[in-house]
Amino acid sequence: MRLKHLALGLAVATALPVAAVTAYAEEGIYIPLFTYRTGPFAGSGIPIANGMADYLNMLNERDGGIGGVKLIVEECETGYDTKKGVECYDAVKGKNPAVVNPYSTGITLQLIPKAAVDKIPILSMAYGLSASADGNLFPWIFNPPATYWDGASAFIRHVADVEGGFDKIKGKKIGLVHLDAPYGKEPIPLLQALAQDYGFELKLYPVPAPQMQNQSSLWLDIRRDKPDWIYLQGWGAMNPTAVKEAAKIGFPMSRMVGVWWSGNDDDARPAGPEAKGYSSLDLNAVGTDFPVIQDILKYVVDKGKSQITSKDKVGENFYNRAIWNSVLIAEAIRNAQKITGKKVVSGDDVRRGFEALDITPARMKELGMEGFAAPVKLSCADHNGHGGISLVEWDGTKWNTKVPSIQPIKDKVLPLINSTAEEYVKANTGWPKRTEPCDKSS
């Protein structure tokens, strides 16, 4: 994989010999990846960056790209900084990107108003603004396969299952330990609504970014408050610190559950045996026992075309999550080619491809991913799918599936998505009404 630095000082990884910017559209399908291999969030960012790039580059090496067209894969380092993320967007938007992956809720929020103007679809896979799942109001934003509100509701359903029913969680105290940033705050409205509906007490424990690795006082507050359950909405260095601090105060790990971004192997591993029993919501399988991952090893990793530093990292949770992210991109591009009859597709075409996305179990098997993730079906109205979420548990060395599928509480989530989406549009004067065409699922 060749590396180059752009004028902004951004690291670039291309799957083709480096071409002039003006020739990108003619030579291939351009896919920029916003990544963060540096800074306090790098522990989460590195495996994601590797997995996304490795799958796309595997398609180039094995298949010659998609539909006979090579993919031009380019990384832009954001450091998980919103300002840098917007700079990355400004740097790539003139290169006819098929899609933009912000990999940050803060960056996503800044790009949402720009997407329709620039005709660039935004894929915020299971992150970003939950309300953007409403495709009628956000035709350029996609956040499959589940929103943060789906995740928070799945957590509450799990709590109810363990406690013996929704009626049994009345009077319980549930704490949300969250990064004090847009990402961390995203589940709060849904949890507040569920607290009112089911009668539990919600306690909020925000963690400012500068204190991510110094949470001792917060966990002393938790020891004092004695919540019955903890939901962790952390990221980067915050996650392993939280797991270690929970163990330190003796909080029962079986009652601490992380969102799917708090389930990296390196989130639990540093706490050693004391992390045993910690659980995380999940969206994908772990391990390398899938033909697709064997192909990534064969065509990319074993040939030295990956930035991964250790082969053992292949198959870990976030690496596999990123593969799933890139599969969604690739399938949307295939759909776009099928719908339009074009080989080199634009962002406008790929938006249509996302809306026609229907990844069935049969298609997962064709992709070499049988059992890797739940099926995903999007539509013009539903840009998420709100699919089943699994729960994995750390056994001291690795993740194991504890609950294969937990359905979101859709009768609570969907009305909130619709009402919040409408509020967003009303608050943003001049928000364009949808005029984009709608295609059948493919």
Where do the protein language model's features map onto the residues?
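Extracellular/periplasmic Venus flytrap/periplasmic-binding protein
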Residues: S130-A131, P139-I249, G287-Q294
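Extracytoplasmic "Venus flytrap"
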Residues: G28-A53, C76-K83, S104, V177-E186, ...
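Beta-alpha junction/loop-to-helix N-cap segments that form part of ligand/metal-binding clefts
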Residues: G28-Y30, G43-N50, R62-G135, P144, ...
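Extracellular/periplasmic periplasmic-binding protein-like sensory domains
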Residues: A246-N325, S405, T420
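Segments of small-molecule ligand-sensing domains
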Residues: K305-Y319, A330-P404, P408
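Gram-negative bacterial Sec-dependent N-terminal signal peptides
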Residues: M1-A23
